[in-house]
Each structure stands twice: as structure tokens, then as C-alpha cells.
Amino acid sequence: MLRHVLCAIACAATLAAPPAAAAEPAPLPLFDAHLHYNWEPVPHFTLEQVLALFRAQNVTGILATSRPNDGTRALYEAKPKDLWVVPFIRPYRVRPDIQTWMSDPQTEELIATEFKRGYYQGIGEFHLSGRAAEAPQVKKTVDFAVRHDLYLHAHADDEALEILFRHNPKAKIVWAHTGFFTAPEQVAAYLERYPALWCELSYRGGITAGGRLTDEWRRLFERYPDRFLLGSDTWVNERWDSYGRTMAEYRGWLAQLPRTVAEQIAWRNAERLFRR
């Protein structure tokens, strides 16, 4: 399916391309801060296919994770000229690890072994709900991240998020999905309370209504323009098939914000956080 999507994009561009003098400016560059290039289960898309898709969508950078970490390594080690890859260690080998990583004695070794490669900038995405975040293995993971100046990419509910910061107040957390449906006023409270918290917006509900930014989220973005990131969350192949639509939806509401705010959320925040 992805191959057909890419072919359609290429054909449409060829047939509809205006003369060079009348060419429209490139769409706003985007950094995808929630990208999974999973190699389990198969099938998976080729490296060439996904790189072509990023290029077609003017996605110029990604926060890359995978299950297992082979996919992330493939993206990073390819060193594509037109894509900045920020690799994170995922504490999963197979999908069932989502439920058990926080109690699996092999998690610590998995993280430490991957970290020795020398290029990872964070750990995650990992899943936590409620008091499961109190597990000793979770605290070890948080402390490892702080000790090595790594970010944590946490798919966590409100309670688990607070526990992560209690484990170590020096933690730097990218909050996957921004709680899904956590009220905007509570999101604002967390941003005030935790200066090293950044909110990633894949699957986040309530941002728009009828294609228009809601007042609550407009205020939040304009008040904290340096604290938000975009993401696709390509956790299943269907998310790859709808990748272009996801990016178009982001650009749709970003266009309703002041240009400086839109650019911060689109890519400048990632540049500030992750560029080495």
C-alpha cells in the first residue's frame, strides 16, 4: 500500500508541476518526534520506501524508535543526507514487552547494551499506567537516563508521569500523546510544574474542532510555544499508509498560528532539544 501511495505522489507531482518560475514554496518543514520503524512483526517497509516518504512530506527530522532496535539503527546508520535522525533506545524486543518491560530483569541489560553504541539520545517510547511506574526497574531506567543526559519518551497517564518525576526530578521527559485527553488546563499545570517536560501531540484529542484550532489549545500553544512537538506514531503499517494525511492535518492547524509559534512546534523545538 505504501508503495502505491509513493507512486501516486510522484505521478501527481510530475503531471501537475507548474513552470519553475511559478513554483509554490515548499511546505513547512516538520520534525516527527514519534516515529516507529518496527521490524517486528513483519512485514515492514524498506528503508528506501520510508526515506522517500519523509522526503515527499518535507519531514526533515525524526525521533526514531523501533521494536526491536534494529530498525532505529538502520535509519541512523544509513546517514541520509536530507533526514536528521535522533535515535532513542526502545526497551522492547517484541510487542508483549509493552506489558512486562518494567518488571523484566533483562530490560536493564538491553538498555545498557544499546547505549554502548554511543549515539542514542533517549530511552523510549515506553508504556506506563498508574502505579506500575513505581516499579524498581522504572526508577533504574529514569536514573540511567539522568546519569547519561538522555531524554525519556513516556507513553504515560497523569499518575505515571508524576511518578517518573518523583523518581528523579532531573529527568527530561517527552510526554507521548500529551496524555491523550488530559485537560488543557492540567497540561498547562504540568508545564509550569516540570520545566523539563515537553508534550508530543500524536493521537492527541481536542486540538481542533471542525478543522479549526480550539481556543484552549491556541492559548496553550501561544503561551508555551517552546514545549510542544509533533509526531506520527507509526506503530502499525496503517499509520504509514496515512502518513501524508497526518502531516497535512498538522500543517492545517499550524497555519492558524503565528508563523514563529508554528515553526517552533513544527521543527525548531526539536532542533533546540536534540541537535548536537
Mark where each language-model region is.
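Structural recognition of the beta-strand scaffold that forms the well-ordered cores
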Residues: 29-33, 60-66, 86-90, 121-125, ...
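Acidic-and-aromatic substrate-binding clefts and catalytic sites of carbohydrate-active enzymes
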Residues: 38-45, 62-73, 94-104, 129-135, ...
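Signal peptide processing junction and immediate N-terminal pro/mature segment
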Residues: 17-23
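Catalytic pocket-lining loop regions of alpha/beta-barrel enzymes
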Residues: 85, 132-230
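Active-site gating/metal-coordination segments in enzymes
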Residues: 24, 70-151, 198, 203-206
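Mid-to-C-terminal alpha-helical segments outside catalytic/metal-binding sites
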Residues: 2-4, 23-31, 41-43, 48-66, ...
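Conserved, mostly hydrophobic/aromatic
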Residues: 34, 54, 123, 145, ...
